């Protein structure tokens, strides 16, 4: 899966689960400050990413995720594992 494909899947997750306009979901966008996610949303996002990749995300790894670009990197790491 390419970075562009991952971004498109993430945009879809944000639109369907958090009612966020996909145009706002850019690699530079901050999850908490710009996209207004909270800690519960972050847990929901981690679950959706696990469903998308079929792999479990370690909570300590996901704690460092702050931007959409970080989410893309986390998905790439999961897919490479």
Swiss-Prot record:
Pfam families associated with the record: PP-binding (PF00550)
Residues bearing the modification O-(pantetheine 4'-phosphoryl)serine: 39
Ranges for domain Carrier: 1-79
Principal subcellular localization: cytoplasm
Modification note: 4'-phosphopantetheine is transferred from CoA to a specific serine of apo-ACP by AcpS. This modification is essential for activity because fatty acids are bound in thioester linkage to the sulfhydryl of the prosthetic group.
Stretch forming the signal peptide: none
PROSITE patterns assigned: CARRIER (PS50075)
Biological processes, Gene Ontology terms: lipid A biosynthetic process
InterPro entries: ACP, ACP-like_sf, PP-bd_ACP
Pathway: Lipid metabolism; fatty acid biosynthesis
Family in the record: Belongs to the acyl carrier protein (ACP) family.
PANTHER family with a match to the protein in the record: ACYL CARRIER PROTEIN
Protein name per UniProt: Acyl carrier protein 2
Annotated organism of origin: Ralstonia nicotianae (strain ATCC BAA-1114 / GMI1000)
Lineage per the UniProt record: Bacteria, Pseudomonadati, Pseudomonadota, Betaproteobacteria, Burkholderiales
